[in-house]
């Protein structure tokens, strides 16, 4: 945690995990995602993610304003990519179905459902 206004939890974080898609995104259905972000219990957060395919292709996304807690619907935006995902744009949503935060260890664990969205690749 970052020493900020009393009663307001602020901190930076890193998240990483598998994104397994039911429908392919640019011909790919399995990614490893890594994200960095700033979380503010009063204002939400700002997150930047890189989704990497097994072949090394990347999709870049931005998430903002949503707290990391169960039941929250997250809205994301694709802002580019590499390889077959170069120039990818679009939006997506998902819902946190379970979350666990261990502030002492600086760990977050979460699971999502209902990942859906639309995209364009030039």
Specify the residue positions occupied by each region the protein language model found.
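Beta-strand-enriched cores of mature, soluble protein domains
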Residues: 1-122
């Amino acid at each position: 945690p970052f020493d900020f206004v009393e009663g307001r939890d602020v901190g930076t974080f890193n998240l990483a995990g598998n994104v397994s898609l039911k429908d392919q995104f640019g011909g790919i259905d399995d990614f490893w995602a890594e994200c960095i972000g700033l979380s503010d219990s009063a204002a939400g957060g700002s997150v930047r993610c890189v989704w990497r395919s097994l072949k090394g292709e990347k999709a870049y996304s931005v998430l903002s304003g949503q707290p990391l807690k169960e039941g929250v619907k997250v809205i994301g935006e694709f802002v580019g990519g590499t390889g077959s995902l170069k120039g990818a744009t679009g939006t997506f949503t998902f819902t946190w179905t379970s979350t666990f935060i261990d502030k002492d260890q600086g760990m977050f664990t979460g699971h999502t459902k209902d990942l859906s969205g639309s995209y364009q690749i030039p």
